């Protein structure tokens, strides 16, 4: 339903503003709506990070956006080769790398004092100069009915870690994310792990 409504709204937006081109990234359902709207209005579509294989519903969305796109900026040689095998003209496929790596390389080595609170951190304030583990668990979109068992396995493995700080990133908003969020709140509210910090994204 969200995708359908987004197509309607984006079609109106593009009709009003007539952009020279539209840039979309990866495999989010909202980007599929953008891609469909732009394509049917004959607006050139540029896709970042096509050709990646995940084995989930996201992969179907990503490949659908690829087939609607006119120009492709891929992150890896493997992705480039995959798009060409899918029938894309190699003259329209450019190996540019992953934009997120560029962002990470520009990250500040010294964080501001209020970084934790400003970025919606919850729990103990981490000491970034010490060793820490980053944990992130998103629901598997094609098997979201198994989310509870999967997050419990991740939590059970994580609670055994006591001698190192853990920074846990909140899940995305895909189907099953509410189950993950609820289990993380149980840990947080009951203070079951004193060495953990949470970041909501």
List the predicted regions and their residue ranges.
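Donor-nucleotide binding loops and adjacent catalytic segments primarily
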Residues: 1, 112-201
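Active-site and donor-binding regions of nucleotide-sugar-utilizing enzymes
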Residues: 1-90, 97-98
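Alpha-helical scaffold segments in soluble metabolic enzymes
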Residues: 9, 82, 103, 153-157
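Short linear motifs at secondary-structure transitions and domain/linker junctions
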Residues: 19-22, 46-50, 69-71, 107-112, ...
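Hydrophobic/aromatic beta-strand patches that form the interior of the parallel beta-sheet core
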Residues: 23, 46, 73, 94, ...
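Generic structural signal for helix capping and beta-alpha/helix-loop junctions
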Residues: 55, 100-103, 176
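Short low-complexity, flexible loop/linker segments enriched in glycine and/or proline
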Residues: 61-63, 108-109, 182-184
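A nucleotide-sugar donor-handling region in carbohydrate enzymes
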Residues: 69-147
